[in-house]
């Protein structure tokens, strides 16, 4: 079996790690395709992947700058021939419909029309709060999701699988659940000593993420307000220059409030990332949106506890497989008296109108009311759905209220799991997300595709998938 794996780039990051882990899994299992090449739009800076071909025009590109879909299809085919000696039996393509380069979406449609056997593995979606990406898909929107028995999809989680299945309902393309692998050879970082780095806080609760808006930095400030006995920190600042002013405003806010909180702590110490993790009492999560949810799995493999926010839409798969996340909270509700309701109403209306306009959709009747009521509920106001200004206002008011602080502590109940519980979660991750199992699943899907009886390809556009993601009740002001 010959396989061509395709992605826009192989820079360090999530998809690159998935591709590298796939290769590692096949090497360790001594199973997998006979030949495999990775086709990418940029030179590969790593050394794990042995067979890599750079394809001009595959990298990120705006619609106005992208090459034609036909040209990219031809270049992909030539790159595969050069490496494999023939066209591949399977095209395994990552994030084809994300809107990072409309030529790839179109090239996939052309490969599908030509009868190619394809595995499409979306990690993220242009329809999910990425309106600029959606717009960049341009005319390729109408053929974004090809379907036929010889074209399969692989989803990271049950939510994505369900959304794809509903969007492709009636088609002949199966949608597999393919969770990412977690390598087993992670260092145990549970017992590191802080003596080497006396400048770092001893009571560190580390949020091991780079600062982006959906990571919900304000909730870290709220937790710091409610738990002054702990020192909270995220690891890295933003790389996106447009988010830098917001990031700096949180740094200034934390300083003015006198919080035990450091944003970008990894950039203020000589400690390496593993050393930071080792020094932390616990890892913490406050993100409001994730694709796969690696941050809910990796801490246990390091021998660390995790506390903070759960994302049941993402972690339902994990808990079904034995991972215990019952100690995490699903939401922090604050009393509506802490909110300027008029400001929230205005922010909700502006955000919802903006989102629907960006996606070229008409705002549904009562949409603003539905969105507002999904944020301001009978239980209270969802803190993680507020924008930065509203979050800061809540924190300022909460700091002077013992009753509010007590309520936040009751809801969040931050504490460390004992060694036995950590070990049980570590075992659940090892058993269900191993490289060995991942490699077998991927190769098993390939075999199913090659055994399919090919039929004429049909196409589903982006609109059904957009229907799944775009609804007033899913509005989060941090994602607009």
Model-derived features: where do they sit?
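Glycosyltransferase donor-sugar binding loop
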Residues: 40-44, 230-249, 254, 261-267
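Short beta-strand->alpha-helix junction loop in the catalytic core
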Residues: 43-44, 125-126, 159-160, 177-188, ...
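Conserved donor-binding/catalytic core segment of Leloir-type glycosyltransferases
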Residues: 4, 196-215, 221-224, 233-234, ...
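Aromatic "clamp/platform" in nucleotide-sugar-dependent glycosyltransferases that forms part
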Residues: 288
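Acidic anion/phosphate-binding donor-loop and adjacent secondary structure
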Residues: 130-133, 176-203
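N-terminal strand-loop element at the rim of the active site
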Residues: 10-12, 25-73, 80
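A short, active-site helix/loop in glycosyltransferases that binds the activated sugar's phosphate group
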Residues: 135-175, 182-185
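Nucleotide-activated donor-binding/catalytic signature segment of Leloir-type glycosyltransferases, i.e.
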Residues: 247-275, 321-333, 337
